């Protein structure tokens, strides 16, 4: 993975070793071939290649996703000095960077510190003071996704949760003011309400060493706890996605 600097005098690239446990971010001066290592991500087991680069301050720094402290967080990296600043401290994973508003001095990102089965929009300041605040409405549990305008003043916001079809809105940021409802799925919601719903239970399974995995169970509409039923178990054990949300 490589990108040109804003002044086209440098190429900044990732160098991932064959074992995929060390990732270097290197800056190359195209005029003299001089190399400068800006960042080293290393893990005893595995390091993932980073797709989510965001240049800020006219190319003087870039935002980087890293699991260097055990959680995936956003770091700001200086091209001049290699200084690395943590922007999103805490015991949770940043799912992705949604956008950067340099006018307000903040980065928007998707995460869910309290419930990993859900997704919300947060923002953190670019100066590294550790302030993080939730932007998605507090009264809307579930999954939120955003497609932001380049200046991060507007976004297409999609919200859904189990049993509720997606609602798509145009919102104004940072106040998350709804400007227009684009898709309300009212007809689909009404039809779903006419159906006999299944009983759904969300729970966690302890797998040892203090680790708990999220799970969910769907029971038949006429479920009788005194009876025996066939059981279908679906397990996804890889790190690339979620099936409980």
Question: Predicted segment positions?
Answer:
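Thioester-forming pentapeptide GCGEQ
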Residues: 1-3, 7
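Beta-strand C-termini and the immediately following turn/loop, strongest in propeller blades
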Residues: 4, 12-19, 26-29, 55-69, ...
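WD40/WD-repeat beta-propeller blade-loop signature
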Residues: 7, 93, 142, 211-212
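A detector of repeated loop/turn-to-beta-strand junctions in beta-rich toroidal repeat architectures
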Residues: 22-25, 71-73, 118-120, 165-167, ...
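Serine-hydrolase catalytic core recognition
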Residues: 14, 136-137, 144-245
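Extended, hydrophobic alpha-helical segments in both membrane/secreted and soluble proteins
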Residues: 8-11, 21, 34, 49-55, ...
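Multi-bladed beta-propeller domains
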Residues: 1, 28-52, 77-101, 111-114, ...
